[in-house]
């Protein structure tokens, strides 16, 4: 992973984190990206669970992220609350607070449902077919600007490969492609400076990709998502995470989009987003 991060901790108060320029979203230069907000929810939930139990005993089966206020590029504080502490089920709510001078405002509410890992059942259950794409090489070097199809722009905050060709691409350049979309995604940034980024945190960020993957039209992305719901049966293995369009539907300016999520060993879950129509599309 390249030596960049989305956030840095405040030197005088480690409970406060500051977004870096890498955390800027595509809709407004003063607005944080939805993917990093998803990451913050998982960051807070993982820290809270680790404080009360052995985190490896549980699987984050569902992550929900509600983004209901403008996420300004301001300092943030993460508040967490254990709402259920059972032996098999633990639920942790996460509140992302924007710290603006003396005013603290909640901009995101998330929840993570943790289920105790046990053994699989013995019966056979029907499952839909999975994609059949070879994952990228573990040794594939990170791209630089010279190899990207967006000359003159900074390196993206994640890398995207076409599973069919193995070549890198930018989804916004795929408006002429009509039909289901697929991609392999690899993170290029650390989440918080000098802190390890967990596999769950990585896939939580990728979950936000359901919006452009499912909702991209022939003229650009015309919906901004207001939430993310991620379901996982296990965490991803390896750096590359695969995504595949599962559903798109829209009516009266409200959209729903979803995608399947894979790693090198197969499907691991799915992500769904609800969106609002934007008067100006993101191209």
Predicted regions and their residues:
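Terminal targeting signals and extreme-terminal segments of soluble enzymes
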Residues: 1-283
